[in-house]
């Protein structure tokens, strides 16, 4: 049925050439054109029947439009990235909070270490100061109202270990509203409290003491009273928990340095900051030795890896330089042996004899002595085998360093910085009473290299100081001699 209908529709739609021919052949008078009745389906098919060229142009236009749209989107994305690099505050979604969702409120403060020497103190202040328009005065200044923080926003402070507690106290006071006492406003005082040291651990410190304690005897006279000895652990917040009944708090003076206070507070897990007038006590966890030296040890490991690679190149160059110096020394001995052989042969196996060889040997020996004396006057140093070897080795070393691409200035700077970091970590280890095993962070080979370079630098420093002292004594002698001569000349006149 569909096929028959489609054939009828096709017959009802004659082509343009057939219609024109039919119009020309028919007479104009009796011409009566009747509009053919065409169904909607035939009209829709006629409208959709497009030539292949038209379809190609439409497809190309759509493709160009899509390509242009993609290019525009890419350009906008690149422009947005450049804008973010130039102005980070104009990034996408800058008006949205960085963290979505409700975070748990901080109930305990922390003392964190930073890559620098500063310490980051985070305090959960439960108070905040708001502007109150009701207390607005004539000066159009908003009054302050005190309210509790439902969501505590921690306060971050950067502190240097050598700054006193009074500095931290002033920083905290600047963030607090004044308290009213006897009708007058007063800045609240801030107190720092740390756990008191235990009254000695009563542990034996020697075999004799342990043996006497096992036998039921009294300990030695040097350890009869350990209540005046403070115990240190250095564990900080990683230490064992103790109940609040076992803790005894001691208030520290505001003139104490922050580093000393932290060192003493590290025996416990935390210290307390009390604010007068608000009955607020904030507990702050204390960093352990590992936390305090985390970034230092990380930098030391990074330096150690670089020092290890440079040390291998330096060791190879130094070994070649010493071999060259020893070859040169052996060559000098061979030259002297050859000279002895020539003198022996000319003296006993030729017709010239000792009469000719004797003055030649005298002149050659005297020339050698004069040349060595002139060289000693030129270098103005001790004439010794060690000094000559050092000069020869150092020249060969510098030549090999340049050949291998070894930067001696970079090496010295790395060694100096690494030794400074080691010294600083040792100081902190002494403060925390902790034995620091540096081979775990540095390595045995790098540790030996650093110790060797430090001893060499110390020897050079001592030799330089010795030369300065000798020069100073010589100058003083000359000055005294001149003063004595001037006094004698003035007395004679």
Swiss-Prot record:
Residues binding Ca(2+) are: 358
Question: Which parts form a coiled-coil structure per UniProt?
Answer: 64-84, 450-470
User: Which compartments is it annotated to reside in?
Assistant: Mitochondrion inner membrane
A Pfam family name for this chain?
MCU
Give the transmembrane ranges: 327-348, 356-378
Source species, domain of life: Eukaryota
- Report motif location: Selectivity filter: 354-362
Q: Where is this region: Disordered?
A: 44-107, 193-225, 230-249, 447-493
Reactions listed under catalytic activity: Ca(2+)(in) = Ca(2+)(out)
Q: Name one GO molecular function term.
A: identical protein binding
Side of membrane Mitochondrial matrix, spans: 46-326, 379-493
Classify the main location: mitochondrion
Compositionally biased intervals (Basic and acidic residues) = 53-98, 193-216
Mitochondrial intermembrane membrane side: 349-355
> Mind listing the UniProt keywords for this protein, alphabetically?
Calcium, Calcium channel, Calcium transport, Coiled coil, Ion channel, Ion transport, Membrane, Metal-binding, Mitochondrion, Mitochondrion inner membrane, Transit peptide, Transmembrane, Transmembrane helix, Transport
* A cellular-component GO term for this protein: mitochondrial inner membrane
Question: What is the membrane topology listed in the Swiss-Prot or TrEMBL record?
Answer: Multi-pass membrane protein
Q: Which GO terms describe its biological process?
A: calcium import into the mitochondrion; mitochondrial calcium ion homeostasis; protein homotetramerization
**Transit peptide per record:** 1-45
Domain notes for this protein:
The selectivity filter, in which calcium ions are arranged in single file, is composed of two acidic rings separated by one helical turn along the central axis of the channel pore.
How does the annotation summarize its subunit structure?
A: Homotetramer, assembles in a dimer or dimers configuration with two interfaces.
What does this protein's UniProt record list under function? Highly selective calcium channel localized to the inner mitochondrial membrane, which mediates calcium uptake into the mitochondrial matrix. Mitochondrial calcium homeostasis plays key roles in cellular physiology and regulates ATP production, cytoplasmic calcium signals and activation of cell death pathways. Sufficient to operate as a pore-forming channel without the need of calcium-sensor or auxiliary subunit.
The family annotation for this protein states:
Belongs to the MCU (TC 1.A.77) family.
Identification of the protein by name: Calcium uniporter protein, mitochondrial
Species of provenance? Neurospora crassa (strain ATCC 24698 / 74-OR23-1A / CBS 708.71 / DSM 1257 / FGSC 987)
Q: What is the lineage of its organism?
A: Eukaryota, Fungi, Dikarya, Ascomycota, Pezizomycotina
């Amino acid at each position: 049925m569909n096929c028959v209908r489609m054939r009828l529709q096709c017959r009802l739609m004659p082509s343009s050439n057939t219609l024109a021919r039919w119009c020309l052949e028919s007479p104009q008078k009796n011409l009566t054109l009747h509009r053919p009745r065409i169904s909607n389906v035939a009209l829709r098919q006629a409208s959709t029947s497009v030539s292949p060229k038209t379809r190609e142009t439409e497809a190309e236009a759509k493709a160009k439009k899509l390509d242009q749209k993609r290019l525009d989107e890419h350009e906008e994305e690149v422009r947005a990235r450049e804008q973010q690099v130039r102005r980070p505050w104009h990034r996408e979604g800058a008006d949205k909070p960085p963290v979505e969702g409700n975070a748990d409120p901080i109930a305990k403060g922390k003392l964190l270490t930073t890559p620098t020497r500063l310490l980051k103190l985070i305090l959960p202040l439960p108070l905040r100061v708001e502007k109150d328009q009701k207390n607005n005065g004539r000066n159009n200044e908003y009054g302050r109202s005190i309210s509790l923080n439902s969501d505590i926003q921690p306060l971050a402070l950067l502190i240097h270990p050598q700054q006193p507690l009074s500095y931290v106290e002033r920083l905290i006071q600047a963030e607090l509203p004044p308290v009213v006492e006897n009708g007058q406003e007063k800045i609240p005082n801030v107190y720092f409290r740390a756990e008191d040291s235990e009254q000695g651990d009563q542990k034996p410190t020697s075999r004799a003491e342990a043996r006497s304690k096992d036998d039921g005897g009294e300990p030695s006279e040097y350890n009869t009273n350990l209540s005046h000895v403070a115990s240190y652990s250095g564990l900080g917040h990683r230490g064992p928990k103790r109940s609040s009944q076992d803790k005894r708090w001691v208030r520290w003076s505001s003139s104490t340095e922050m580093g000393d206070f932290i060192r003493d507070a590290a025996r416990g897990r935390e210290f307390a900051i009390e604010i007068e007038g608000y009955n607020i006590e904030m507990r702050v966890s204390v960093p352990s030795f590992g936390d305090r030296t985390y970034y230092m040890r990380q930098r030391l490991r990074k330096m150690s890896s670089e020092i290890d690679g440079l040390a291998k190149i330096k060791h190879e160059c130094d070994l070649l330089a010493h071999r060259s110096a020893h070859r040169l020394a052996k060559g000098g001995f061979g030259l002297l042996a050859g000279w002895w052989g020539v003198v022996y042969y000319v003296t006993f196996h030729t017709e010239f004899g000792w009469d000719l060889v004797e003055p030649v040997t005298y002149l050659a020996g005297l020339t050698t002595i004069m040349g060595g004396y002139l060289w000693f006057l030129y270098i103005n140093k001790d004439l010794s085998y060690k000094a000559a070897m050092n000069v020869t080795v150092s020249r060969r070393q510098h030549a090999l360093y340049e050949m291998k691409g070894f930067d001696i200035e970079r090496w010295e700077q790395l060694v100096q910085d690494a030794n400074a970091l080691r010294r600083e970590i040792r100081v902190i280890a002494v403060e925390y009473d902790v034995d620091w095993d540096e081979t775990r962070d540095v390595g045995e080979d790098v540790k030996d290299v650093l110790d060797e370079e430090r001893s060499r630098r110390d020897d050079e420093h001592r030799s330089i100081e010795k030369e300065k002292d000798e020069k100073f004594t010589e100058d003083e002698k000359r000055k005294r001699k001149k003063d004595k001569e001037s006094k004698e000349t003035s007395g004679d006149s």
